Amino acid sequence: MSDLFAYTDGACSGNPGPGGWGVLMLAREGEAVVKERTLQGGEALTTNNRMELMAAISALEALTRPTEITIVTDSAYVKNGVTTWIHGWKRNGWKTADRKPVKNAELWERLDAAQQRHKVVWRWIKGHAGHAENERADELARAGMAPFKTR
């Protein structure tokens, strides 16, 4: 049985501006990578946080059956949101503690739904700190953004 990891990243040129997301999915047996899959996409007008969310959503939605997966993100916004803040938001009808609407609520709801059928471990790592897999996810996010950038 292999262990599945999804390294996710979002990128934005301007905030808001054109943006992209990328996912590097790796199945590992020990240290050996036995399968690799990449995903990427983008939007013409978006934010970095929306692209970080889309990367995580896309990783989970790409899974065809219930799976144990570790999602590795450099976004504290995604990690804290999905592991901590979301519980209060759901209790409060997708409002923050000070009763304001949650930003990107439709994406948080989609992420919440996407993770329900899986056993997900969420891991945060520092971005641009020499993690090869995170750098690959960043390259994919930039490639996803490229068609939407004007020179």
From Swiss-Prot:
Its cofactor is Mg(2+). It comes from the Bacteria. Residues 1-146 form the RNase H type-1 domain. GO terms for biological process: DNA replication, removal of RNA primer. The keyword Magnesium applies. One of its GO terms (cellular component) is cytoplasm. Gene3D superfamilies: Ribonuclease H-like superfamily/Ribonuclease H (3.30.420.10). Keywords: Cytoplasm, Endonuclease, Hydrolase, Magnesium, Metal-binding, Nuclease. One of its GO terms (molecular function) is magnesium ion binding. Its EC number is 3.1.26.4. Signal peptide: none annotated. Binds 1 Mg(2+) ion per subunit. May bind a second metal ion at a regulatory site, or after substrate binding. It is found in: Cytoplasm. The keyword Hydrolase applies. Mg(2+) 1 binds at D9, E52, D74. Mg(2+) 2 binds at D9, D138. It is an enzyme of class 3 (hydrolase). It catalyses: Endonucleolytic cleavage to 5'-phosphomonoester. It holds the Pfam family RNase_H. SUPFAM superfamilies: Ribonuclease H-like. Its main location: cytoplasm. Belongs to the RNase H family. Endonuclease that specifically degrades the RNA of RNA-DNA hybrids. Monomer. This is Ribonuclease H. It comes from Cereibacter sphaeroides (strain ATCC 17025 / ATH 2.4.3) (Rhodobacter sphaeroides). The gene is rnhA.
